[in-house]
From Swiss-Prot:
InterPro entries: Transp_IS110-like_N, Transpos_IS110, Transposase_20. The keyword Cell membrane does not apply. Keywords: DNA invertase, DNA recombination, DNA-binding, Fimbrium biogenesis. Coiled coil: none annotated. Pfam families: DEDD_Tnp_IS110, Transposase_20. May be the site-specific invertase required for pilin gene inversion. Moraxella can express either a Q or I pilin; the inversion of 2 kb of DNA determines which pilin is expressed. The keyword DNA-binding applies. This is Pilin gene-inverting protein. It comes from Moraxella bovis. One of its GO terms (molecular function) is transposase activity. GO terms for biological process: DNA transposition.
């Protein structure tokens, strides 16, 4: 039985849906709320499609997609959440320059039919809670940095007035760290994954929770390369003939917090502190890579190894991951 792919381009208040089946397509716009979800159901039923053949391809726009995705799962629909960068690249490969909500929905459906992306599984309640705690910690960390920077610019006569704010944000970060690790230690699946990640040289207590949130059980990513792309760590090459040969870069897309969490471990690894990665660092140096390129390559390597140990359910092995 062939699948029917429904592409969904979502915004804060509305979403456009388009299905492609038997070389024909139909599209419609709905409100991004429970009423709109029910109207989507009626629209699907009006076209006599079996729930078991439906596959919803939803673009990951902010957090606007989450309610619809959870609703779809509760109604036994297959769901894939797709990185907008993939759709942009797919449109570029087809030579499509027009960008409208309806056009994006059509593209998502076509992308689903061509790539059959992995199915999305909702996070457990504790994974959702861990994500929320980490976001709150990041907010408090930004506020702490802001206050410290502000204090440096203040006159010596008024610096003491910011001390209370700095103390407040520092204490709240300490409390959040305690809650984060209490949650990890008390949740069997999180604790197990954490124990696997902890075997990777360079991965410490500050980085580990970010990896748990980003990777989950690993099923949301087709490969380690897809995870690296999601994190914004996939290399971009710019080379043509013999005249154009620019330095590779990673751009500025993807998960900024995850990259930030991986940065310091990568810096430490780059100085040869961990024997397990010394050969890798030397190979990069012999290729003439800059220090920045080496650090980015190590960040990517730490991330892909993290994915591997979780997917394979095996601790770090120097012989495999060297």
């Amino acid at each position: 039985m062939s699948k029917t792919y429904i592409g969904i381009d979502i915004a804060k208040n509305t979403f456009d849906a388009c299905f492609i089946a038997h070389n024909t397509w139909q599209n419609c716009t709905f409100t991004n709320n429970q009423q709109g979800f029910m109207e989507l159901t009626l629209w699907i039923q009006a076209h006599h499609y079996n729930t078991s053949t439906l596959h919803l391809i939803i673009e990951a726009t902010g957090t606007y997609w989450e309610k619809l995705a959870h609703w779809a799962i509760s109604h036994h629909h297959k769901v894939s959440i797709v990185n907008p960068l993939y759709i942009h690249a797919y449109a570029k490969s087809l030579g499509i320059r027009t960008k409208t909500d309806k056009q994006d929905a059509i593209l998502l459906a076509r992308y689903g039919a061509k790539e059959n992306p992995p199915l999305w599984q909702p996070k457990s309640d504790n994974e959702i809670k861990l994500t929320a705690l980490l976001k709150q910690r990041e907010h408090h960390k930004r506020q702490l940095i802001k206050e410290r920077t502000r204090q440096e610019a203040l006159s010596i006569y008024v610096k003491s007035y910011t001390d209370d704010n700095i103390r407040h944000w520092s204490d709240s970060i300490t409390q959040l760290d305690h809650q984060i690790w209490q949650l990890i230690n008390c949740t069997p699946e999180l604790n197990h994954r954490a124990s696997l990640l902890a075997t990777i040289p360079g991965i410490g207590k500050k980085t580990l929770p970010h990896l748990l949130v980003a990777i989950g059980d690993g099923s949301s990513f087709q490969s380690a390369k897809h995870l690296a792309s999601y994190a914004g760590l996939a290399p971009r090459h710019h080379q043509s003939g013999i005249s154009i040969h620019k330095q590779s870069s990673i751009g500025f897309s993807g998960q900024k917090e995850l990259r930030s969490a991986l940065f310091m471990p990568a810096v430490i690894v780059s100085f040869g502190r961990y024997p397990a990665f010394q050969k890798f660092v030397k190979r990069m140096e012999q290729k003439g890579k800059t220090k920045k390129q080496i650090i980015i390559a190590i960040m990517r390597k730490l991330l892909t190894i993290s994915y591997a140990v979780i997917r394979q359910n095996r601790p770090f092995d120097k012989r495999i991951h060297e």
